[in-house]
């Protein structure tokens, strides 16, 4: 008698789902803690490619938090992809283009530029002419046209 057990439970809420080219897929919470994905499936920012837990923790947490909370990006971006040289690309729901972020630095500014570009080209859907929209250059968007088939 008199024995008391106190348990403090702190829920970890994942903010991104990583499916790397090599290794096990994982969820990561806002504190950079990874957790296994075999227990449940959540609708989160999907990260693919050359992503490790360390890279995700150092480079993708802020980006995933931004994408999950900022309209319209939380519904317009379906995938975050990490290339073999660790450049970050976004795959939008609409269109057949790739959005090149480069790094996750200045993500808010980069996405403002992208939003302004989409707004300016939405009437004639001119953004569909491009294979890539590169936001990695400060203050500009460099567009690469699609190759003719």
Predicted regions and their residues:
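Charged, solvent-exposed interaction patches on well-folded alpha/beta domains
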Residues: 1-149
